[in-house]
């Protein structure tokens, strides 16, 4: 039987995705049930425990193919946006979630219990989350979008219809994350890692990207010479386990664990520091256009 990447294929010794029958061995196979993320943000963990490693996150409105739910409140499934497999909190998912109509375009969109920003926010939606909006209301000159199911309201200007044109410049989207906190496994504007910065920014420009750096390096763009004199805006610079986005021929934007945030720094300085700390040389530069 073939060895498949467990990050992108749902299989264990005891259970596997029915679509993998004949490809991997398992005691049983399941077709899975599609559920929608109803939490603002849902953790995806390596194991069914709240203290297990955070491998990624799912945002409201995304769909998950669930293969198993445990009595302890965990759902083992696959995020359909990028194929990532892991354990989700069961209460963050619903088979009856409303079909999204809009996507969030603000870095953070607070959710209020009603159409009034003076009410205490009950949560917050990150950039790229998808929501179902059923109407509008105006309070003191500010227009609010009303969420389906009476779940509250957001400022209407912070969301656009799903069919709205994508962003033209993914680098400009990435720059909006400047100073956002670094979070290993994070995939939202509340905290994210280097590959999530690339994935989210490209998603706003209608470009699908894998979740992890090694997968991105294989899938995105074409290789160009890893030479500081030849890089330009939008190029992706990869290391083993890291990626950054070039703003121009000199400066790079990246979610840096060293700096604990999204930062801009000269590419040359990043290359020297990463090598000095044992991260090796840049492995490739990829150009999307």
Predicted feature locations:
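Boundary regions of SH3-family modules and the immediately adjacent low-complexity/disordered segments
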Residues: 1-33, 49, 62-65, 72, ...
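Short, basic/aromatic beta-hairpin or loop at an interaction surface
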Residues: 31-45, 98-112, 203-219
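Short alpha-helix capping/helix-loop boundary micro-motifs
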Residues: 47-53, 111-121, 218-228
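Short, well-ordered loop/turn sites that connect or cap secondary structure elements
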Residues: 52, 58, 125, 230-231, ...
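Loop/turn positions that initiate beta-strands
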Residues: 61, 122-133, 233-234
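Active-site nucleophilic cysteine motif
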Residues: 174, 186-205, 209-210
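...with weaker cross-activation on analogous glycine-rich loops/strands in unrelated enzymes
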Residues: 207-268
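Low-complexity, Gly/Ser/Thr/Pro-rich intrinsically disordered linker/tail segments
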Residues: 272-289
């Amino acid at each position: 039987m073939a060895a498949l990447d467990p990050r992108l294929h749902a299989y264990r010794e005891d259970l596997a995705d029915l679509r993998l029958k004949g490809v991997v061995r398992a005691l049983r196979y399941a077709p899975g049930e599609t559920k929608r993320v109803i939490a603002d943000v849902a953790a995806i963990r390596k194991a069914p425990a709240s203290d297990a490693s955070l491998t990624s996150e799912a945002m409201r409105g995304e769909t998950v193919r669930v293969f198993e739910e445990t009595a302890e409140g965990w759902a083992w499934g696959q995020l359909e946006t990028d194929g990532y497999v892991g354990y989700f909190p069961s209460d963050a998912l619903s088979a009856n979630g409303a079909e999204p109509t809009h996507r969030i375009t603000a870095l953070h969109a607070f959710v209020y219990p009603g159409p009034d920003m003076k009410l205490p926010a009950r949560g917050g939606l990150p950039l790229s989350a998808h929501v179902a909006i059923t109407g509008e209301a105006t309070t003191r000159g500010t227009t609010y979008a009303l969420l389906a199911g009476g779940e509250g309201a957001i400022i209407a200007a912070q969301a656009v219809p799903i069919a709205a044109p994508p962003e033209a410049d993914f680098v400009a989207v990435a720059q909006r994350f400047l100073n956002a906190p670094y979070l290993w496994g994070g995939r939202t504007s509340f905290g994210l890692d280097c590959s999530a910065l690339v994935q989210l920014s490209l998603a706003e420009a209608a470009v699908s990207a894998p979740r992890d750096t090694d997968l991105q390096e294989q899938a995105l763009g074409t290789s160009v010479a890893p030479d500081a004199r030849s890089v330009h805006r939008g190029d992706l610079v990869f290391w083993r386990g890291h990626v950054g986005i070039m703003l121009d021929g000199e400066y790079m934007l990246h979610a840096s664990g060293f700096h604990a945030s999204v930062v801009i720094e000269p590419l040359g300085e990043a290359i020297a520091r990463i090598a000095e700390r044992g991260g090796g040389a840049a492995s490739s530069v990829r150009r999307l256009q």
